[in-house]
Amino acid sequence: MKRVCFAALCLAFMLEACRNSTSPVASSSPTSSDISSSDQVVKAYSHFIPTSSPPTNLELVISPGFHINANPASFPYLIATEVKPGKADGIAVSDKLTYPPPKMETFAFADTPLAVYEGSVTIPIPLTPAPGAKGQRTIPFEIRVQACDHEKCYPPSTLTASLPIDLDAIRR
């Protein structure tokens, strides 16, 4: 009975999170002529799902026809995607993140394939609650990206995201 109640509670929480989520809904994709900086084609969303491991992740959504450099970038002169977690009382957030595997793409401006991210990219955020820490916390993030299309790259941007976390839900 306890498992059924717990499963129902988790499902209700996840449905509520989806209903209140800031997850992306495709609207119209920008065109190259409309773009003046990378933040116009890359959006950052945070997700807290207490039943996953880790329970937190950051999702970058890149508009169709664009890409961002992977981490690590293919060459030192390329600007790699970089996530910098901020501080939150009662939570230790690792600054050593594991970035997803890139897609290797060939572009007219490069002699060799480049490591890039396209579409949706999920970056797990490992965290450790401090002993005895309870309640709600919010972790701020800065995400450095440089968006490119098949012909050129746009000025880099630093995106921000906030990740609300319920420490009590993680410990259940």
Where is each model-derived feature located?
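N-terminal hydrophobic targeting signals that begin at the initiator methionine
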Residues: M1-K2, R19
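Sec-dependent signal peptide recognition
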Residues: K2-A8
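Extracellular/lumen-exposed scaffold segments
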Residues: R19-R172
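C-terminal motif of bacterial Sec signal peptides marking the signal peptidase cleavage site
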Residues: M14-A17
